[in-house]
């Protein structure tokens, strides 16, 4: 029987491969005490692998070029999980170390505490990984915390004119790293600081720093406060909807997944940002990383509050604010039946706004 040809991957993730156990509880216990775990789920981390798995669930051909895993039960679990989710790429095995394990603890306040194993020996296996999948792809994703091991992959992508998405987090505070990576990066996702507590001015300052370094698209994420994306003169500030948080682990990678999905679909920046925020917001409402269907994400995306600005003369200017997408937006009208279904889902999952009693009294008088 002839072997069925696979569609070349549009997305390539490059980085660590590790199984993870995610535990959901009410709040982290005090030192030397315990807590009841409500639910446990497992997945494949780190962020590059999360995104590959997420995009595969949305029907995007994806592949992973990762670190070697041990010849053990956990290593085989990683390979089996990736194959089951349709993620392409060869998983390499080694007898030099055991497969690393990550444990994430998520509480209802939206915090997540993680415990991971990342040794130079494990990360060093990235230096011998086969990069041949990159040249036929449409986007390469790398994480800054994998260190200089990512440079080889980024240079390979640049050689073949493949855009590079860098998850830089707070790495931009190291000017030497920013200078080194800027010429290789197309899209850069960052946070204002390690704790993500910066306000609007910090977001603007971080975006300005990345653009001035030569990066084409700067994404600044602010956890529950949403994000800001700057590309050329265009700026979109999106506010995350209020949702009941169950598990925040993987939310940042799910945002990246949503942004990359829109990018690969050829959507404009606002449509892409809406989808990314909606996907991340929905992800935290349940444990694990089973993605919501695209039409349901689009339903929530329509409700995202947006502020538009322009960047001219080294200054930021607000041009308009609105709550809903224009009626003629192609994302809304791509399939009326699906969009109606998505809107109903959004109405069900998002909290209803409370009516102001003062407005009620005024309307009765009028």
Roles of regions detected by a PLM:
Residues 2-12, 203-366:
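Conserved phosphate-binding/catalytic region of the ribokinase-like
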Residues 1-31, 41-43, 320:
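Positively charged, low-complexity intrinsically disordered leader regions
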Residues 52-61, 262-265:
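Alpha-helix C-terminal capping segments
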Residues 7-8, 31-37, 57-138, 300-364:
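Conserved N-terminal subdomain of the carbohydrate kinase-like
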Residues 135, 151-162:
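Glycosyltransferases and closely related glycan-assembly transferases
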Residues 33-44, 246:
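A short acidic, glycine-rich active-site loop
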């Amino acid at each position: 029987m002839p072997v069925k040809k696979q569609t070349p991957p549009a997305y390539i993730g490059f980085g660590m491969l590790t199984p993870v156990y995610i535990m959901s509880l009410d709040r982290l216990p005090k030192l030397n005490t315990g807590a009841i775990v409500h639910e446990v789920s497992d997945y494949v981390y780190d962020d590059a692998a999360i995104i590959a798995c997420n995009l595969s669930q949305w029907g995007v051909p994806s592949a992973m070029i990762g670190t070697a895993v041990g010849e053990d039960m956990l290593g085989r679990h990683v390979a089996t999980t990736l194959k089951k989710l349709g993620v392409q790429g060869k998983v390499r095995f080694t007898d030099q170390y055991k497969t690393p394990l990550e444990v994430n603890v998520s509480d209802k306040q939206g915090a997540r505490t993680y415990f991971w194993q990342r040794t130079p020996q494990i990360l060093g296996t990235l230096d011998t990984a086969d990069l041949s999948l990159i040249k036929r792809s449409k986007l390469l994703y790398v994480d800054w915390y994998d260190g200089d091991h990512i440079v080889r992959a980024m240079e390979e992508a640049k050689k073949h004119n493949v855009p590079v998405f860098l998850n830089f987090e707070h790495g931009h505070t190291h000017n030497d790293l920013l200078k080194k990576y800027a010429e290789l990066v197309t899209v850069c996702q960052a946070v204002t600081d390690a704790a993500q507590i910066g306000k609007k001015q910090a977001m603007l300052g971080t975006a300005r720093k990345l653009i001035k370094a030569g990066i084409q698209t700067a994404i600044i994420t602010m956890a529950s406060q949403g994000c800001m994306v700057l590309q050329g003169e265009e700026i979109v500030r999106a506010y995350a909807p209020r949702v009941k948080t169950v598990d925040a682990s993987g939310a940042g990678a799910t945002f990246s997944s949503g942004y990359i999905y829109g990018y690969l679909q050829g959507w404009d920046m606002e449509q892409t940002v809406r989808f990314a925020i909606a996907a991340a917001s929905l992800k935290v409402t349940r444990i694990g990383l089973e993605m919501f269907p695209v039409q349901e994400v689009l339903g929530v995306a329509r409700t995202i509050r947006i502020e538009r600005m322009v960047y001219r003369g080294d200054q930021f200017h607000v041009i308009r604010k609105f709550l809903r997408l224009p009626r003629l937006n192609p994302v809304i009208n791509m399939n009326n039946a699906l969009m109606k279904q998505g809107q109903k889902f959004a109405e069900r999952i998002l909290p209803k706004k409370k009516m102001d009693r003062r407005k009620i009294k005024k309307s009765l008088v009028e």
